[in-house]
Design a protein with these regions (language model features):
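Short acidic-hydrophobic, aromatic-tinged amphipathic segments that line or gate anion-handling sites
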Residues: 201-209
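Short secondary-structure boundary segments
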Residues: 109, 135, 166, 184-187, ...
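Substrate-recognition/cap helix-loop segment adjacent to the acidic, metal-dependent catalytic center
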Residues: 30-32, 52-62, 83, 91, ...
Length: 217
């Protein structure tokens, strides 16, 4: 296997976090006096940084965005975080990689303390060698998060791959100088066509396909 380090995005890649994220979004919109989100807007919240979705997609001011993020995190920390569930076969995939000597980590836009709590409650102990996420102010780019994970792992970029479900992941991998595998079972890419235009070495529809692709690279 070419890769000595495999990094996963979290939302829409490691775990289906939609139920908790959707509930937190609706709570935050209600608390800030906005109309409920429709299905398309809810889906857009899974993966990207919260500052992006509230400002660019909801049209909020900076002050409104700050209040919305506070409300989102209030609900998410109490309830939404624990509504998540790993995708079928994900724990088994990770453990098989670990048995082959691969170092496994997470690089997510989710706040790092939330990511650690979620993964610690949903995956067996020892699955992840590093968990890197966003800072509380949501100022880190995906590339910076990826690079922080690589640095902590002591990995070489040429032997590292990021797996994710959105163009944010693809762009972050490219900016960080690592390979990228797109997945179509999350909330971003829905098919191979969606991943066109972004550097990637493969497109996978489930965990079995991820494992098979990594084995032949």
């Amino acid at each position: 296997m070419k890769y000595k380090a495999v990094l996963f995005d979290l939302d829409g890649t490691l775990c289906d976090t939609t139920e908790g994220v959707y509930a937190a979004v609706q709570y935050s919109l209600e608390k800030t006096g906005h109309s409920p989100a429709d299905d398309a807007l809810l889906k857009a919240f899974v993966g990207p940084p919260l500052t992006y979705t509230y400002t660019k997609l909801c049209g909020m001011t900076e002050e409104e965005t700050e209040r919305a993020i506070i409300a989102f995190r209030e609900f998410y920390a109490d309830k939404g975080l624990y509504m998540s569930k790993p995708y079928e076969g994900m724990a088994e995939l990770i453990m098989s990689l670990k048995k082959k000597g691969v170092r496994v980590g997470t690089a997510t836009y989710k706040r790092e303390d939330f990511a650690k709590s979620l993964l610690g409650s949903k995956f067996p102990e020892g699955c992840f060698d590093v968990i890197k996420g966003s800072d509380s102010a949501c100022t880190l780019t995906k590339a910076q998060i990826v690079e922080a994970a690589i640095s902590e792992l002591g990995a070489d970029k040429s032997e590292t791959v990021l797996i994710g479900d959105t163009h944010f992941d693809a762009e972050g991998a490219a900016a960080a100088g690592v390979d990228f595998i797109a997945v179509t079972y999350g909330c971003g890419f829905e098919n191979e066509h969606d991943a066109e235009g972004y550097p990637h070495i493969g497109v996978c529809g489930n965990t079995r396909e991820i494992g098979a692709l990594l084995d032949i690279l």
